[in-house]
Amino acid sequence: GILDVSRQQLKGASNGWVVASQRTANGSTILLADPHTELQSGAYYEYRIQAGDLKSAGFSLGPLLWQANNNHLSWAMTTGNPDMWDCYAVEVDPENPTRYRFDDQWQEMVEFEETFGVRGGETVTEVLEYTRHNGVLSPVVARRGNTAYVVSTSQMHDAGLLDNEIWRMNQAKTVFDLRDAMTGLGMFPQNIVAGDSAGNIWYLRAGKTPIRPPGYDWTRTVPGNDSATEWLGYYTMDEMVQMLNPPQDFLQNNNVAPDRMLTDRNIDAAAYASVLFNDTPGRITTRGLRALELLSDADRLTLADAHDIAFDETWITAKYWVAALQYALVQFPGWLEEQSAETV
């Protein structure tokens, strides 16, 4: 039958790369934004808009002009993030489980009653409980005995900040404008790869990241009954993992660690707070390896070349399998003749 391309899903992966104008045939910066989403997604939509000073085209996330080109500047996003969330274990009052202890006082949880529609079923009403850890509403996600487990995220209360930031990003004309637009750190955790018409390219590992007090293992649940584990503030834009105009004149982040965006490791993980780098140094995907191979060899890149790179189907590790199988055929020359569908 006819292939329903709207139902083809590629989950958990995105590609983003940019080649500066110095390495392209026509002197234009070329950027790929490939979010690996469905053509008819419930969240992402391809769009083109012109309204007054706003001229933008790309992929929207709901109403937000998410991955965009505005004739002066383009950017792509791929999954990758600083550490922006923490889990707290909080003692609750056994006589009143909606109260929790904080700095030797009982505090009342904030409660909201919400009703959720269920497709094909009856609505469900739940009471949602929150504490006020780190100055933000922090949801109770589990209970065990007299302990409530609470998740605190720096993104809570920042929805309006994100809207304003996306608007300013779409108004930017250079990567320097883009950086200024993002200094409020309202962006969701993402790898941002950007390029402008002047040939500048830039990478940012975006995400509003808390500064934690020392002395705790923040990779696990921490005590949440006093202010000793309250966040001390947030890292600034200047402290975030980023790179501007590398000498290779290209950048790629196909879901790789920040130090594997180039063949030479221009980013040193040790130079950043671990919660900002927040990845295994040297980790790379097969998509990242292939992008490095193709982009490193690209010179006087054309749009046709970029198209070929975007749709390249080479599986970069296949050559090792071919070599191993060729070796096996030499070592065991009669093996194939002895096999059947039942024995392979």
State where each predicted segment sits.
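Mature extracellular/secreted ectodomains of secretory-pathway proteins
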Residues: 343-344
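Mature extracytoplasmic enzyme cores
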Residues: 1-339
